[in-house]
Amino acid sequence: MKTILKILGGLVGLVLVLAIALVTWLSLREYRPEAEEIVEIEGSGNSLLKAGDSLSLVTCNIGYGGLDAEHDFFMDGGSDVRVESRQIVERNMEGIRSMLQEAEGDIYFLQEVDIDSKRSYGFNESEYLQEGLKGAAAFADNFLCDYVPYPLPTIGRVHSGILTVNHYMAESAVRVALPTSFTWPVRVCQLKRCLLVERVPLEGSDKELVLINLHLDAYDDGTGREMQTRQLAELLNAEYEKGNYCIAGGDFNQTFSNIDPSLYPVQDRENFSPGLVEVSDFGEGWQLANDPSTPTCRLLNQPYDPKDAATQHYVLDGFLLSPNVKLEQVQTIDGGFRYTDHNPVKITVTLSE
């Protein structure tokens, strides 16, 4: 009996030592971005922009090519950690790229774009999308971890971020770090959220078009999203006070104050509970641009079945426009969640003279 207890004690001790070693290693290797970092712009846009011009923007969370209609996700109440093969990722990415090309945007804000992750079988999605969409491309890391040790099987290595592809001549791009509510040791393997801020000079003017690509917190208690939205509002208002034109867009992981909540009532708050973007928090004249006629996101608690009562839809994706940007049209492009758990949103706007 004593021998058995010694063996069990030794095994428990070994597990503890390995766990401590893993946490220590991950802590030493934790991605710790600066408050602001310059982002390299690859390629170049071929169009100039000036006040009075109209332009179109498309935002889409591509779900790293692994969240198609046939799959669920463990964080949303499902069981899948990744799809079964690289071929599925490639098929999804081909469908996503075609859908974005057909949207014919001048500027694309894309989220959950993998560079080299186990979950997407090492497929470089940023490079693939840049080849298909053309233009000036800026990529900002927001999930960089050598090994995410949960669930079983584990997520493993992740290198992912947000990508802006711009057909106009961008002057600069900066990664702006966002606050988080997560603390050590949970923080070590969590996303490091950010804003990807790109500046486009306006012909014949000292003003700029400020583009902000974003992907805010999802699986926190709501505190992180609130802090991140507050920082976004401060940045946008500071730029608008300079006379600049501002367009922020992406996956807010929140619903919007201009949408009737009864359109897509939240039935499942246990697996995901979205916050609320209140447009009045941004100041007078700011405008939310979204199209609630079609949902932009689904809960990944199960493979997609639009007729199932357990299917949960949301409107979490869209744009925020400064008072000097006029909204001409907004449309949620219905992709049927075939290749990703989000639908693209396209807007056409005019920069007021």
Please provide the spans of the model-predicted regions.
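N-terminal, active-site-proximal structural segment of metallo-dependent hydrolase catalytic domains
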Residues: 2-150, 154-159, 353
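Surface-exposed cleft-lining segments at the edges of enzyme active sites
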Residues: 79-85, 113-115, 179-187, 215-223
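Conserved beta strand-loop-helix elements of the APE1-like EEP
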Residues: 131-133, 157-173, 199-201, 281, ...
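Low-complexity, intrinsically disordered Gly/Pro/Thr-rich segments
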Residues: 325-336
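Metal-dependent phosphoesterases centered on the DNase I-like endonuclease/exonuclease/phosphatase
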Residues: 220-323
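Solvent-exposed loop/turn segments at secondary-structure junctions
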Residues: 64-65, 114-117, 143-146, 170-171, ...
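Active-site beta-strand/loop signature of hydrolases that rely on acidic residues for catalysis
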Residues: 56-62, 92-122, 165, 198, ...
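A well-ordered secondary-structure block
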Residues: 33, 144-209, 213
